[in-house]
Structure formats: C-alpha cells, structure tokens
C-alpha cells in the first residue's frame, strides 16, 4: 500500500513497528545522550513521532526545540494532525547542550524554520562542532540554508533535489544515506532505515569536521 494512502491508525501502528524493528536489529544504546528535534508547525507527523519513539526506546533524552510556541502541530496528508509539546524554546536552546540533531520534513515546517536566523545558526553549529545530524524528506532544506551540504553525499524528497545540487551536494536516490555523521532519507516510507542509521550515528558521537561545513 502506498504510504500516502495509509490511514491514521495504520500510520501510528507503523511508527510502533518501526521502533520495534529498530530495537531488534540494532543494539546501539543512547543512554546519556541528549538529542534535539528542531521543528515548527507543519512538520510531517510520522517524520517526527517515529524517530522520537526510536530515540526514546534507545534511551536517549529527546527534547523538542521550536521558536516561540508551547506546542506545535503536525501536518498529516491533507490536514492538520497531532500536536507535540515544545520542551525548549529555540531562543534558549544551546547546541553545546545536545549530542545530536533531528530535522523532520514536511513542506511547511522547514520553509518557516529557514526564515528564522536563530534556527539556521542552531543547525550550522552542529556541523561546526562535528555532532551528528539526521534529516528526512524536506528537512535538508535547513541544511541548504545553513550552507553545510557542499561536498556531501545525501538524499531528500525528490522535489528539492535540484536545490541541493545547486548548493553543492551530491544527491542520490537511496532510502538512507550516511556521510560523516549526516543521515538523510527521502520520505516517510524510508523511516525504518532512517531510524536505524540515525541511532547508529548518534551512538558514535562527534565526527571529524569538514572544512566545507565550517564556512561562515
């Protein structure tokens, strides 16, 4: 069944199955690791909640970071979906307090975040330090804005392929791509592979910094 045609109930079940599949196939443990999920209204529902559940099952301390709101609302297919509580306002979030970063997609979410200078700088700081980052679907739009994709191999939702190439990325059509601590995937259908690689890279911790990721 195509992912876009699944019901809300089926989608929630998929998130649970994805997390369970991850736990059976990946023994990495994130106990003691603190992970930020940067998002705002219009994030793709499964692309936040599925990684969130996988990270929590790996015993990570996960915080939702967002600008200016107590809670944010997902977009689900053609309408608004579930809400999630914001744990840390963007204005108070410090990259040095986190071990890794997740960037969910959704058409609305990254388009709003990329216009927030504090959000762009927050993302860039993870690359400057060499901390692992996972971005899915339209999430890599934030990587373009932060100017951290030049020379990197990655994937994304197909509609932003040209934008990523123009920003200097090597775009490939794979379900999950790992490049020196950066994990990317194309769509919600890739979540099982995305979650597994995300946790694996987050467990490894800081990666060697690249000069292209340190541009001002």
Q: Where are the model-predicted features located?
A:
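Catalytic nucleophile serine of serine hydrolases
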Residues: 137
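Extended, subdomain-level signal for the structured scaffold at the beginning of enzyme domains
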Residues: 15-129, 133, 141-153, 161-216
């Amino acid at each position: 069944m195509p992912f876009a045609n699944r019901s809300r109930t089926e989608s929630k079940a998929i998130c649970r199955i994805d997390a369970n599949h991850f736990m059976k196939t990946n023994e990495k443990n994130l106990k003691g690791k603190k992970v930020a999920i940067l998002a705002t209204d219009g994030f793709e529902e499964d692309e936040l909640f599925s990684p969130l559940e996988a990270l929590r099952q790996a015993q990570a301390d996960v915080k939702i970071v967002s600008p200016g709101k107590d809670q944010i609302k997902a977009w689900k297919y053609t309408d608004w979906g579930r809400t999630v509580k914001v744990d840390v306002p963007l204005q108070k979030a410090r990259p040095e307090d986190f071990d890794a970063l997740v960037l969910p997609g959704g058409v609305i979410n990254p388009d709003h975040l990329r216009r927030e200078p504090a959000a762009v700088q927050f993302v860039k700081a993870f690359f400057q330090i060499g901390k692992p980052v996972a971005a899915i679907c339209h999430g890599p739009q934030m990587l373009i804005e932060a100017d951290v994709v030049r020379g990197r191999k990655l994937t994304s939702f197909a509609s932003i392929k040209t934008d990523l190439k123009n920003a200097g990325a090597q775009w490939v059509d794979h379900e999950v791509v790992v490049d020196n601590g950066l994990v990317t995937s194309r769509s919600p259908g890739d979540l099982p592979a995305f979650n597994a690689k995300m946790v694996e890279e987050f467990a490894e911790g800081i990666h060697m910094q690249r000069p292209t990721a340190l541009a001002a």
